[in-house]
Curated annotation (Swiss-Prot):
Name of the gene: frmd8
Classification via InterPro entries: Band_41_domain, FERM/acyl-CoA-bd_prot_sf, FERM_2, FERM_central, FERM_domain, KRIT1/FRMD8, PH-like_dom_sf
Main localization (coarse): cytoplasm
Cell compartment(s), UniProt: Cytoplasm, Cytosol; Cell membrane
Keyword Cell membrane: yes
Keyword Cytoplasm: yes
Function of the protein: Promotes the cell surface stability of RHBDF1 and RHBDF2 and prevents their degradation via the endolysosomal pathway. By acting on RHBDF proteins, involved in ADAM17-mediated ligand shedding. May negatively regulate Wnt signaling.
GO CC aspect terms: cytoskeleton; cytosol; plasma membrane
UniProt cross-references to Gene3D superfamilies, sorted A to Z: 1.20.80.10, Phosphatidylinositol 3-kinase Catalytic Subunit, Chain A, domain 1, Pleckstrin-homology domain (PH domain)/Phosphotyrosine-binding domain (PTB)
Protein name in UniProt: FERM domain-containing protein 8
Amino acid sequence: MDGSETSHSSGLNDFLLRSSVSSGSRSMDVIVYLINDEIIQLTVDGLSVITAHELHKSIREALQLPETAQDVFALWLISPFLEVQLKPKHQPYKVCRQWHDLLARFTNCSSNDILQDEPFLQFRRNIFFPKARELQIAHERTLYLLYEEAKYNVLDGRYPCDVEDCELLGGLACRLELGPYNQNEHTPATIRPKLDSLFPPYLCKKRNGFFTTFKNKGGRQASFEQTVLNTYKEVKESSACTEEQAMKNHYREYLKKCHELPYYGCAFFHGVVDKPAQGFLNRSGRKPVSVAINLEGVSVIDRKEKHILISLTYPELSWDHTYPDEEEHILWLEFDGDAEGTPVNKLLKIYSKQAELMSGLIEYCIELSQTTESPASDFLPGNSQLSEKRSKLRRQESVLCNRMKHLNTIDYVEDGASIKRVKPKRTASFFTRQNTHYSAVQPSETPTET
């Protein structure tokens, strides 16, 4: 998706075609990308005034998707620096014309990067589509597109997974893409060339062109390809259903497994957080993070290590967005915690020029959740077993564990007394934003940050 290696002239010419930047009412060709880089080429009239809703309809017709897919997918404008989901009323052409202004406002791009960057249109999952409804989809092509997007995010590291979960997902991907397991056809040698499309590359370390090995749950050495092959063998098949129905079942199984990840279906934003002071010189710094926001909550992910730093559902947090004069935009997350056994409130500062976007999305998701059905996890069978499994994973230092020791937070207690740090000045309490089970915290008289 990064076209930085192309010249500005050729990149712009390509952009005029693929991203709807044109003027006039004559017919124009538009290229829209799917998450797997498949393209949809459309010829549309009045490109400069066409809405995302109208373009969405043309894409559904081209893909032969049912009308129900209108809620499942959305049009996005994507570049390496910014991702924007378009509302149905948005006009993609006009948003594209404003792209450089958006980059200047919501990113830290250099002037040269802003001038060179061009977005493209992508058809992908709507972040406001509930997971519960996703598992009720019966249309195979719709399920396929959702599967492709989930798999892409797993392989790309946007959805960090434990090795065991990646093995299971890799086995399901083998079944979906290679057909039912056949011991004569499917061997480690046939799986090896496909590993990059089955297993996240960041979990694989190549040596002399071959994948190294890791210890599985039994402690013995097993190659990546053999481990994926073993999970492929274990994929359950039903002789009572057709291959078409079996494919649908396996798509749902893959998606259902991804639903266990708190950041499934999220919009992702760039930010940095303070590191705790370390070492003899008590040095600190900042850590690049991805902030993932969906209908259920907010997750802060270490972009380098590919694991959660903290994940909170909306009832567990309060938030605010501040932009002090001549200072950075900050998204504040407030949540319960403890300091050496003392219950405290914790404040996490996320520095990001996209803090305004994040705050607005959090507010909208909370409002939406108050008017719609409960999150999908409440409807999944065996939910108590899932909760038990999640607890077990966290005890084993899963990528899903909260890692508070890697975060530098401001801690304080309800009477305003500081625990090493004190509450910063604010004009309003976090708790005016939403009703939670937290008690309002009284500010200290002379708050300062250390």
